[in-house]
Regions:
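Conserved, non-catalytic sequence blocks in retroelement Pol enzymes and Pol-derived host proteins
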Residues: 19-30, 54-58, 67-70, 103-112, ...
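RNase H catalytic domain
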Residues: 118-142
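A short, polar/acidic, helix/strand-boundary loop motif
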Residues: 83-114
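Flexible loop/turn segments at secondary-structure boundaries
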Residues: 2, 12-13, 72-75, 84-87, ...
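Acidic, metal-ligating active-site segments
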Residues: 62, 66-91
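Structural motif corresponding to the C-terminal cap of alpha-helices
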Residues: 40-47, 51, 55, 82-85, ...
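Conserved pre-motif C helix in the palm subdomain of viral-like polymerases
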Residues: 1-7, 109-121, 125
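C-terminal reverse transcriptase regions that engage the nucleic-acid substrate
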Residues: 1-57, 63
């Protein structure tokens, strides 16, 4: 979500067919200024390098959870790993991706399908990488 406004501003600038040495249109400039203001308010975002925060032998189940969404401006997907242990349930962000909606107008259902396709393309390599570390099958006993 952080880069979508910049991608949208770039797309808007490209659509306006301005020359490379001209100033940005006000709409694009306002989007960039708004993004910079919001960026300073975000603070620090930290992600753990190791997603299995509990002992491997105490893990009851591991599952991948994916979400996709779309709007008129963009669509995207995110994949989390959900780890259940006897004491707690942890969820960690693994990967996310966003895309600006195509310049040709699309319906929201079509953009939702593009988001689902993006998510499917995110899940496959994550599942492949994690399957060499831990069993992700639904009935796996850890």
């Amino acid at each position: 979500p952080m880069v979508v406004p910049l991608k949208h501003a770039f797309q808007t600038a490209c659509r306006s067919n301005i020359s490379w040495d001209c100033n940005l249109p006000d709409e694009c400039l306002n989007l960039v200024k708004s993004w910079l203001k919001n960026l300073s308010e975000v603070g620090t975002i930290e992600f753990p390098r190791y997603c299995f925060s509990c002992e491997r032998n105490s893990i009851k189940s591991v599952s991948l959870v994916g979400f996709a969404d779309a709007s008129e401006i963009a669509f995207g997907g995110v994949v989390y790993v959900r780890i259940e242990s006897p004491n707690a349930i942890h969820a960690n962000l693994l990967v996310s991706k966003s895309r600006v909606a195509p310049t040709k107008p699309q319906t929201i259902p079509r953009l939702e399908l593009l988001g689902c396709l993006l998510l499917a393309n995110l899940v496959a390599p994550v599942q492949s990488a994690l399957s060499s570390v831990i069993d992700l099958s639904p009935n796996a006993q850890h």
